[in-house]
Amino acid sequence: MRRLRLSSMMLAFLLTVIVSAAAQEVVKLPAPKTEGGMPLMQALKERKSGREFSSQKLPLPVLSNLLWAAWGINRPDGHHTAPSARNAQDIDVYVAMSDGLFLYEPKENQLQKISADDIRAATGTNDYVKDAALNLVYVADLKKANMKEPDADFYIGADTAFLAQNAYLFCASEGLQVVVRGSIDRPALAKLMKLRPEQKITLAQSVGYPKK
């Protein structure tokens, strides 16, 4: 009986290790293509919101380019494609896809797997969010921001908007459907994302190919 109990405990431990290892999976992204694309003025002309998505996934090179456009590093000193107040770099970009939730790590140009669960439907209150290839979830780190309210809310809102507009312009250049959203059950989503108390969801943005 004791041997059986020990075997059960060992099996439970191994399963925990396996699940933990799966959650810590890292996806290395291809180097972003930082030249070419649609001219800026044309991308501004084409920029729009769309809410009808096909189920087609984004290829890794396109995903890499999207994330770099939104919040990639574009200078040797570690600065980003979008500004941030006091250079706090306080916004994290999470990517919710059918194969799990990932954290974009711009310095390493990689995705850190947070969960294997498909939480796309929980990233907003609109039905279409579950159909988009991915949903970007912008999360502010209040500890990094190091500001008191209401200044913190103002600046993290502005910082998030810069990232979202970068993503909009990339999607216009690439012919992707995109819409930024504020209608989110933030407490429920934060729990699914395993966020820390000092992390605050600001906006989400659905991205994918247009429905044909």
Locate predicted features:
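Bacterial N-terminal signal peptides
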Residues: 9-18
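A glycine-rich helix N-cap at a beta->alpha junction
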Residues: 195-212
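Bacterial N-terminal signal peptides that target proteins for export
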Residues: 1-10
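Generic beta-structure capping elements
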Residues: 32, 139-141, 208-210
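Small-aliphatic-rich amphipathic alpha-helix that forms the alpha element of a beta-alpha
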Residues: 47, 66, 93, 134-189
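N-terminal amphipathic, basic helical "cap/leader" segment at the start of enzyme domains
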Residues: 22-132
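Short secondary-structure transition/capping segments
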Residues: 190-194
